[in-house]
């Protein structure tokens, strides 16, 4: 740790990244990590600037990796160029997870649901160890304000619901 960090370990409005030490949030990190690891779905919300991203990056993500998970950060675009399912699949591929198909795609996977995609693949880290994707949707609430197509929203929520209720 450098001298500047020892003098003032807080970053103000900047967020912490994975691997950095976050001060004064040990209890929150412990509580949230236990909740995430024991539940299918967890919502972390709060005012802007209170440290949600820092807690995830510097606290939760390292613990998730130790638990056999790989964090997959997803910030959805709402411009209708790519549908949400394709964006989630792309984020999984971009996360560094290696994938192996354990079943063939039914229709060339063009209409494959998120549930089918997640269950048709096994996921591994770079060392070939089996891993579970931890899907983290950043700014998820934007879907309610930026996505004007109600059918698009409804279909995405249906797909997420199917995955979560498995």
Per-segment meaning from a language model:
Residues 1-166:
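Amphipathic helix/helix-loop-helix segment enriched in hydrophobic residues with interspersed Lys/Arg
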């Amino acid at each position: 740790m450098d001298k500047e960090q020892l003098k003032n370990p807080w970053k103000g409005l900047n967020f912490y990244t994975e691997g950095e030490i976050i001060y004064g949030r040990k209890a929150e990190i412990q509580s949230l990590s236990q909740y995430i690891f024991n539940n299918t779905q967890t919502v972390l919300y709060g005012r802007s600037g209170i440290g949600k991203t820092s807690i995830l990056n510097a606290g939760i993500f390292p613990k998730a990796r130790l638990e056999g998970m790989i964090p997959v950060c997803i910030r959805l675009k709402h411009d209708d160029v790519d549908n949400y399912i394709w964006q989630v699949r792309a984020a999984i591929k971009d996360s560094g997870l290696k994938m192996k198909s354990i079943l063939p795609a039914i229709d060339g996977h063009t209409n494959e649901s998120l549930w089918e995609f997640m269950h048709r693949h096994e996921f591994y880290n770079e060392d070939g160890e089996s891993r579970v994707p931890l899907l983290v949707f950043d700014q998820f609430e934007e879907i309610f304000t930026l996505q004007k197509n109600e059918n698009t929203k409804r279909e995405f929520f249906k797909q997420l619901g199917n995955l979560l209720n498995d």
